[in-house]
Structures are given as structure tokens and as C-alpha cells.
């Protein structure tokens, strides 16, 4: 749950403590400091700043959330539970910035990777809405059929029914 700058600072401090402990021949502290620095580096590759980005997204600070997500240089190294949320957040940010081609790409990847049911419903709803904007009836209906297979709240069901009604009017 660190930014990259905070991770670097923590690693440097831990390595300095380890070096100091090694100088005073307290090898247990040296080993502990190195292991903790290793866990911070491991967290960078496996977790990334996704939790911080999600917090910024909920605060409606979309640019900050996007900047945090884009600091992840190799998203393919993320934990398999974090990858879908990386794509989901990027897709939702793209929807809010009205960049529908990127939104469709990221939300499509997130839907395939395995989101929780509620988040999957939101992703499929956005994908159906993007298909409606693009006047792509077939693709929109596929997303709606997929969304109907999962348990959704009444709010999402009513939104999907409205999207489906509008999709059926497309010739």
C-alpha cells in the first residue's frame, strides 16, 4: 500500500539499518532488515499501488488514480487477484474521461480475468453501454446476456433493462 517513492524510501531505510546492524555485528537485525526490504520489493511487483489507486478513484480523483496505476511498469507481474482490478480501475477511469475505446479494452480484459460478481456486473454494464454508444447491437446483447447470468442489484438490473431496450431499437 505504498507509492513507488515510499517503497524506495522504506527500502533505503531498512538497508541502512541492516548495514548499521551488520557493522555492530548484530546479524539477526541485519537479516531481518534485508528480509523486510525484500518483502517491500516483492510487494511492489505483486501488489503495486492498486489499493491507493482504488482509494483515489472512490474520492473521484481520477487523474491521481490513473497516475498511480500507470506507475506499475509491468502489470503482468501483479498478483492474479490484482490484475483484474488494475484493468477494472483503468477501464472505469477511461469511462469517466469519456475515452470509450480504452474503456472497452480494459473492461473487457477485466471481465475475462475474473472480478467479483458486483464488480463484474458494473464492468458488463459499462461494456453494454459502450456498445450502445457505438451502435453495436450484437456485442451489446452479448454483454447483457453475460450480465444476466450473475446476481445483480436491482439498480443494475434496471439500468441493464434500459440499455437492452435501447439496443433493441437499433436496426
Residue ranges and their predicted role:
Residues 1-54, 58-60, 64:
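Long, contiguous interaction/recruitment modules in multidomain scaffold/adaptor proteins
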Residues 51, 82-89, 122-129, 159-166:
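"A position-specific structural signal for the A-helix of alpha-solenoid helical repeats
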Residues 62-63, 100, 137:
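TPR-repeat structural position
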Residues 70-74, 108-113, 146-151, 155:
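Amphipathic alpha-helical segments of tetratricopeptide repeats
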Residues 78-83, 115-120, 149-162:
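Boundary/linker segments of alpha-helical solenoid repeat arrays
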Amino acid at each position: 500500500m505504498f507509492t513507488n517513492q515510499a517503497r524506495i524510501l522504506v527500502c533505503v531505510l531498512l538497508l541502512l539499518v541492516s548495514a548499521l546492524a551488520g557493522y555492530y555485528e548484530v546479524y539477526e537485525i541485519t537479516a531481518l532488515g534485508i528480509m523486510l526490504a525484500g518483502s517491500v520489493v516483492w510487494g511492489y511487483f505483486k501488489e503495486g499501488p492498486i489499493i491507493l489507486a482504488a482509494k483515489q478513484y472512490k474520492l473521484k480523483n481520477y487523474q491521481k488514480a490513473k497516475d498511480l496505476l500507470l506507475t506499475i511498469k509491468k502489470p503482468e507481474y501483479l498478483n492474479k487477484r490484482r490484475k483484474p482490478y488494475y484493468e477494472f480501475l483503468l477501464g472505469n477511469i477511461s469511462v469517466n474521461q469519456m475515452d470509450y475505446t480504452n474503456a472497452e479494452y480494459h473492461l473487457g480484459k477485466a471481465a475475462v480475468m475474473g472480478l467479483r460478481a458486483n464488480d463484474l456486473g458494473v464492468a458488463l454494464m459499462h461494456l453494454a453501454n459502450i456498445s450502445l454508444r457505438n451502435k453495436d447491437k450484437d456485442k451489446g446483447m452479448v454483454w447483457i446476456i453475460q450480465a444476466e447470468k450473475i446476481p445483480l442489484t436491482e439498480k443494475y438490473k434496471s439500468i441493464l433493462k434500459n440499455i437492452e431496450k435501447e439496443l433493441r431499437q437499433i436496426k
